[in-house]
């Protein structure tokens, strides 16, 4: 390995580490802001810090292989979404203080949507990244799990959009009305969040960590 590529790999590892910790931290902070008082006492700082970690991570990744057009294009899209999330993050705190304010609630919904888009796009970034790495097993695993993640998120969005569309209709068959009532229960919403968010986030974190290990192994050798 040439010494010239070592600084580039350092930025890559730093970016992957920031993404690995930033994903669950952002999700946890945004949820806690809605239900707990402790993070609210810190004001806007927690969601700004966690979304800032994601933005920092993507910016660090962009310093690896800047000549690869497909890789950089995928990163630019992820960076744009990370920047939007960073800009909208303070509204999580504002909404937690004034939950009845419709404007804040709509901004938080927009943040949830762009956050999901970021997760979607970052899975595409991982596909581009592992295509440049020499580990065939990692490429196969990433190809399978990112496709599964993307299909899961798209299906969840379609399902959620379908429920909202049906809820707006005036006349529906009794069976559909009963299904909508079940879907609106707290338990059903929790299950939807688990499928739509927690599963893709956990699998993405696993892929990020495996990719980081492969990069470190290429520099220092495999772990004993």
Where are these regions (language model features)?
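Membrane-interface extramembranous regions at the lipid-water interface
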Residues: 1-98, 109-155, 161-165, 180-184, ...
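Membrane-interface segments at the starts/ends of alpha-helical transmembrane spans
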Residues: 100-107, 143, 175-196
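Transmembrane alpha-helical segments of integral membrane proteins
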Residues: 163-174
